[in-house]
């Protein structure tokens, strides 16, 4: 078996919602089953000029028996803007708020035919609103989501992947 290798690169960007931001992505790729489906662990973190913070990590495993699993974990503290509900909001309706989000996903699937996998997943997301404008729409506790909340669920899934390499494919679906 080949040895694994580290990959890493800086992240720099600009969007109107974030301003300038920067951080890094780092990963370890272990080609236990060759180049087609290497197992890996990837992580990213960045910070923006608008005090937004995001961290994420995804360990992903491919086994010889056709099992594929991953655990996705993320954290965000992401000051943002809220305008209201519906298409008739105005720019003056804008109010600032800061949510904090922790989320995760657990996925497991097995290959039933070459390239075809079926399985299940569980997702969890907890959001807390840390800051909101005094007297704004989000101060109204009757507005769904104005205090945050938890979403959680399980589901079935299927995937079809015949790529010759999941990171840099030249053929397949």
Give the location of each predicted region.
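Gram-negative/organellar outer-membrane beta-barrel architecture
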Residues: 2-8, 13-150
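Short boundary motifs at domain starts and secondary-structure transition points
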Residues: 1-2, 165
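Loop-centered beta-sheet repeat module
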Residues: 149-173
